[in-house]
Curated annotation (Swiss-Prot):
Keywords, sorted A to Z: Coiled coil, DNA-binding, Gibberellin signaling pathway, Nucleus, Plant defense, Repressor, Transcription, Transcription regulation
SMART domains: WRKY
Source organism of the structure: Oryza sativa subsp. japonica
Protein's recorded name: WRKY transcription factor WRKY71
Region entry Disordered, spans: 91-141, 246-287
Amino acid sequence: MDPWISTQPSLSLDLRVGLPATAAVAMVKPKVLVEEDFFHQQPLKKDPEVAALEAELKRMGAENRQLSEMLAAVAAKYEALQSQFSDMVTASANNGGGGGNNPSSTSEGGSVSPSRKRKSESLDDSPPPPPPPHPHAAPHHMHVMPGAAAAGYADQTECTSGEPCKRIREECKPKISKLYVHADPSDLSLVVKDGYQWRKYGQKVTKDNPCPRAYFRCSFAPACPVKKKVQRSAEDNTILVATYEGEHNHGQPPPPLQSAAQNSDGSGKSAGKPPHAPAAAPPAPVVPHRQHEPVVVNGEQQAAAASEMIRRNLAEQMAMTLTRDPSFKAALVTALSGRILELSPTKD
């Protein structure tokens, strides 16, 4: 083979397949891979929006940590206050429920807080309130009153504890009672005769009952707070339902003297019958006198009490009317001044 042919790679007729050529092996050079650090050589330019977001994120993280610390401090203070409150409630319950032998409440470790100690000492040193003087009370009654005052103080201690005073709220609610009376369905007056004097001040129809409801106020005394609502029953229109709210602050009016009148009429009729009637013979003169004398006396007392109560209510109504009149004071001052001038001595 000619040398110029062997030098041409395209015209090489070398038949050594799979065997490395010496010239080719000598000419191969190892490749060196060079890793270039592009991040350090050429730093990336940050977007101003990204920088602003990173700053905002850092600020929010710092604020979140600060809020977490504040929340932990508040939770610790709340737990401390809750424990103190529970201790105070327990101590007040023990003092009010009969724990008077222990002068001051102690904590779990056995130590007494200074504020509670001072409070208990002041309560122990303070004398009980003196009993109200009573001119007709016996001397031995005076020794019982301090105990009653101590019991009242214990009740006040129980009421001022953490438990709600339900009894006070129940006493503030007006007393409600109902009365059922049979009445004629054709009677539309809605009047229930219960012995008191009432003044009607309103009437309306409710949703649950087609019959109207009437509203009354007690007019027997000016300051009586009792109200009455009268309405027919929705199930039976022959029944009137009277609902009373409150309690009367006066006595019940005396009933009419029908029994005394009936007894007097009966005695007159029995005296006027003929003597030959066997069943209606008149009794002895002394027996009717003994029977009717208490009734007459009782009727006189009731009439006197009724007239006294009517005069008292009339005086109260007149006083209220005069005090509400704005011109009453001016007229009273004028009358008094004129009377004083008339009675004053005049100098000659």
